[in-house]
Amino acid sequence: MTSPAPEPVSIDSVALAQALIRRPSVTPADEGAMDVLQRQLEALGFNCRRMKFGEIENLYARRGTERPNLCFAGHTDVVPVGDSAAWTQGPFEAEIQDGMLYGRGAVDMKSAIAAFVAAVSNLPRDLPGSLSFLITGDEEGVAEDGTVRVVQALAAEGEVIDHCIVGEPTSANLLGDMVKIGRRGSINAWIAVDGRQGHVAYPQRAANPIPVMVDILSRLQSRVLDEGYEGFQPSNLEVTTIDVGNTATNVIPASAKARINIRFNPAHQGKDLRAWIEQECRDAADGFSGRVEALCKIGGEAFLTQPGAFTDVIVAAVGDATGRVPELSTTGGTSDARFIRSLCPVVEFGLVGATMHAVDERVPVQEIRDLANIYQALIGRYFAAFA
């Protein structure tokens, strides 16, 4: 005797977004946000696995065993609220005022998670393939025990994800006007020059680190990294801090520190930029009696998901729901898509990002419902194209 079909469960995207926002999951805290999501996914028939690395909660949920496996990726952690007194609505109260849902994470990106869950709840369970969710609590922080660790674990287990959608707020001005198909890479460098402190009247008794630091930064900034790359902005280097810790007017400081960031397109690889930074530091230190050190950390490589059948599905789904034709873009900062790209083709699509990370972060309630409709159309078109 066959088991009766499970009762259909319809999930309201706005109500779920509110439930998630009410969990103050400021990175790296979870505060029960994963529990809220897991309960909803289990009600929809998903097999949920909690994957904890360090203190970070992660969730991989899958429904179905066949291919293709379409995955939605996102994060439940949020950035700090700043001055809570400056908010017109409590940052974790998830209040709706004048058709706007307020709260930290409303845009980035709890509402997108809720919209995709709602979309899945309105579709039949016997889709010709599998649906999965890869959700982390470590995207807004150091991002060392989140998506990158889950991806490594899934790859080691032989788990296959065929395509992935990351629900970051990619839309620029109107929902559906932009889809991200790639990102520039990122490398941070911490540069330290240690000299010898002394009196400014007796420079021969000191080793001033500042001229060496100025030379290093001048060398790095004088190079034009490139003029751009097909589909990408030019790479750019920015000095983000310089510090000598010296308030005296008659003292040569003992040390100078600086930090730089490079956002680079596919014309470069992180390892080559790291080698260049280290070499420029060595050259600037030639003849200096002190010590120069550069510590570089590659945050992610540049990547591009080539336009094709997968992006066509997303463009068509946006058109179905909004009548818009989205721009396929690689602008903006990094996201966890940089880790997922090693598993499968990945694109990013979500809400308008105008108020993300801001005081009074908010999203129109109707925009959440419209996003759920787009995701629902996307899922249907995906399995029609790839199953």
From Swiss-Prot:
Binds 2 Zn(2+) or Co(2+) ions per subunit. Pathway: Amino-acid biosynthesis; L-lysine biosynthesis via DAP pathway; LL-2,6-diaminopimelate from (S)-tetrahydrodipicolinate (succinylase route): step 3/3. HAMAP family: DapE (MF_01690). The active site is at D77, E139 (proton acceptor). The lineage of its organism: Bacteria, Pseudomonadati, Pseudomonadota, Alphaproteobacteria, Caulobacterales. Its EC number is 3.5.1.18. This is Succinyl-diaminopimelate desuccinylase. CDD domains: M20_DapE_proteobac.
